[in-house]
Amino acid sequence: MPAGACELPSGHCTGSHARLTLCYRYAKNDITPKTAPRMTFFSVLLALIIEQVRALSPSNPVFALFQFHAETVAHGLDAGKQKHGLLAWLAVVLPWVLIVALIYFLLYKVSFVLAFLWNVAVVYFTLGFRQFSHYFTDIHLALNNDDVPRAREILHEWTGIDTVDMPVGEIVRHTLIHAVVASHRHVFGVFFWYVLPLGPAGAVLYRISEYLARSWSTPGEDRTAAFSTFAQRAFFVIDWIPSRLTALGFAIVGNFEDAIYAWRNHTRQWPDPNDGVLLAAGSGALGARLAGPLAEPSSLDALAVGDSGPLTVGDDCTPRTLQSAVGLVWRAVILWMILLLMLTLAVWVS
C-alpha cells in the first residue's frame, strides 16, 4: 500500500465510494474505535504523575469559582423543601458537566492531542490525591517522632473532631477511617466515572456530586436539613458501584479473607452503606480494628466518633498500621492501572 494511504480495518465494505468515505472519516477522527481507551489510560497516568510532582492547591481558582457557584445557588434556592434541593443540584451539576463535555467534543474535532490534554487537565483537577494525603503523612511523621500533641493538632485540622487527650491508638484509628474514605472519593471514584463513556464529564459529575453531598449537609444557620436530601441521595446512587469496586480492590491487594468477611458481616455497623462497605473491607484488608459507629448517616465526622466497639477482625491500630495503609492504597492504584492497561491492550490488538 502506498505511503500515506488509508488502511481500513478488515470487515469494512470494499466499494470504491465507500472506501473513500471511510478513509475521509478516519482521517477526520470521526471513527475512533481505539483512541478512547488509549486516551483514558495515558491521561490518568499522566495526571497521577503531575499530581504527585505538583499537588493542586485546594484554593485553586477553578475550585474557588465552582464553590462560589455552588454556594450562590444554595443560598438562592434553599427554601426548606426537598424539591428546592433537586433544582439546586441540577443548576450546579448540569452546567459544569455539559461545558466539560462540550469542550472535549470540540477539541476532539480539532485535534486528538488537544482533547488528550483536556482530559489530563480534568483528571488532574478532579483527583485530589495530595489534597488529603499530606494530612495523613504529617500525622504519620508526628507519631514516628513521638510528637503526639502535633498529631492531635493535625487530625483536628483535617477532620474537625475533638482530639484533646486522644490516645495514640485512637489517633491512628480516626486517621485510617478518614484516609480510607478519602482515598476512594479522591482517587478510585474519579477513576471509575472517568473510565465510563462519559469520560471527563463523568469525572466532573462524581467530584461535584461528592462535594455537594458533603457541603450542603454541613449544618449552618442558612442551610436547612431538607435541602441537602437530594444531594445525599444522588451521591449515594452515583457512588454505589465505585465504592464496592474500591472495596473489592482493597480485598484483592490486602487480606482477602478478612476483607470479605468484614464486608459481609460488619458493613451494617456503619451508618452510611457505601462508606460502610469501604471501611469494613478496608479494616479486614489492613488487619486493623476500626470502630463501627451508630451515628448520623452520611457524616464522615460521625463515622469517626462512634462507641459501638471495634470490628472483630484484625489487631489494634498502631502507627505501623498507617504505613500498611499507604501500601494498601498504592497497591490498589496499581491494580486499577493494570486493569486499565489490559483494557487498552485488548482494544489495541482487537
Region locations from a protein language model:
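Hydrophobic N-terminal alpha-helices or hydrophobic patches in metabolic proteins across all domains
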Residues: 33-350
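Short hydrophobic alpha-helical segments enriched in small aliphatic residues
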Residues: 14, 18, 27-30
